[in-house]
From Swiss-Prot:
It comes from the Bacteria. Keywords: Acyltransferase, Lipid A biosynthesis, Lipid biosynthesis, Lipid metabolism, Repeat, Transferase. InterPro entries: Hexapep, Hexapep_transf_CS, LpxD, Trimer_LpxA-like_sf, UDP_GlcNAc_AcTrfase_non-rep. It comes from Rhodopseudomonas palustris (strain TIE-1). This is UDP-3-O-acylglucosamine N-acyltransferase. Belongs to the transferase hexapeptide repeat family. LpxD subfamily.
Length: 360
């Protein structure tokens, strides 16, 4: 359940209010004034908690729950114990999240809670930097020359915003992050330790490996979220671009000249080599590695821990090392398993050889 010490909730709500906010139906109106003070999973919930159910895997937890109310679809409504108020919703988890966003709005942004709104006395801000009203700069952050920061943006403790960087409105730049050679849109969230705009990995690999100047930028469009420890290299000649609405998990490495489309989802520890392109709505599972100059089409999906060396057409699902269409991958894995099982059966049928003869 949510920790109220870290995430103080709003005042409690009645089930009638929750039904209105989530567009759910309160099945028994006699529960309309029952108050909910927090959220919890079915197995941890008490009489003042709201929970949800939409997966039969958790049937035992539902049967034994002490929750005060449960969001559930009409299909599973009859499984809810009689002492639990039923909120009927077409998509229970979506309704649960809608109320969670209302109750714990502070949890939606990577605030550290260090310092008060405004400019901390220990922050260092260059005289040529331009900050709109209602910008917060936390302790020990450094803002360089000619930086521009939009209203409502928070620069976390110890962050460094290098010369010429432009940051839009209502952004959160996590503690310890470092931004250079970058243009950042509105409502961009960066969790702690992001590094944006450093050199791309560009060398002439011969003899002493001659470094290639990296003179491009990083452009991050509106509504992008970057997980902790994510790094995005600036382009060499053209820009590295992260498209609007894309969500990137922790510890992802994005190489120089990469173009990522809109509303992509990239899970933790992916590595994207230079000059590749992701279309819109692409999904990458955790620890996917993609070769340089590859094109991943709109809506394509890549399974976790895959290695991609070839371009993937739009809308296809690929996986494996090296990645290929998932149906092909599954057939190959099944064939290998059958081959291994057959080989194991033959080995087990052979008489013991004499390699261990004489050992005690």
């Amino acid at each position: 359940m949510a920790s109220t010490s870290f995430f103080p909730p709003r005042p409690s709500s009645t089930l009638a209010e929750i039904a209105s906010l989530t567009k759910a139906t309160l099945v028994d109106a006699s529960y309309a004034e029952h108050r909910i003070t927090g959220l919890a999973s079915l197995d941890e919930a008490g009489p003042m908690h709201l929970s949800f159910f939409e997966n039969l895997r958790y049937s035992d937890e539902l049967a034994n729950t002490r929750a005060g109310a449960c969001l559930v679809s009409e299909r599973f409504e009859g499984r809810v114990p009689s002492h639990v108020a039923v909120l009927r919703a077409r998509r229970p988890f979506h309704a649960f999240v809608a109320y969670a966003r209302h109750l714990y709005s502070d949890a939606l942004r990577p605030h550290t809670g260090i310092g008060a709104p405004g400019i901390a006395p220990t922050a260092v801000i260059h005289e040529t930097a331009k900050l709109e009203d209602e910008v917060t700069v936390e302790p020990l952050a450094v803002i360089g020359p000619d930086v521009e920061i939009g209203s409502g943006t928070v620069i976390g403790a110890g962050a460094v915003i290098a010369a010429g960087v432009k940051i839009g409105r209502d952004c959160d730049i996590g503690a310890g992050s470092h931004l250079q050679h970058a243009l950042i849109g509105n409502n961009v969230l960066m969790h702690p330790g992001c590094h944006i705009g450093q050199d791309g990995f560009g060398f002439i690999f011969a003899g002493q490996h001659t470094k290639v100047p990296q003179t491009g930028r990083v452009i991050i469009q509106h509504d992008v979220e970057l997980g902790a420890g994510t790094t995005i290299d600036r382009g060499s000649l053209r820009d590295t671009v992260i498209g609007e609405g894309t969500k990137i998990d922790n510890q992802v490495q994005i190489g120089h000249n990469v173009t990522i489309g809109r509303h992509c989802v990239i899970a933790a520890k992916c590595g994207l080599a230079g000059s590749l392109t992701l279309g819109d709505n692409v999904a990458l599972g955790a620890m996917v590695g993609i070769n340089n100059h590859v094109m991943i089409g709109d809506g394509a999906q890549v399974a976790a821990m895959s290695g991609v060396k070839d371009s993937i057409p739009a809308g296809e699902r690929w996986g494996g090392i090296f990645a290929r269409p998932t149906r092909t991958w599954f057939r190959e894995m099944l064939a290998v398993r059958r081959l291994a099982e057959g080989s194991g059966a033959e080995t087990a049928a052979r008489p013991d050889d004499d390699r261990d003869e004489g050992r005690g």
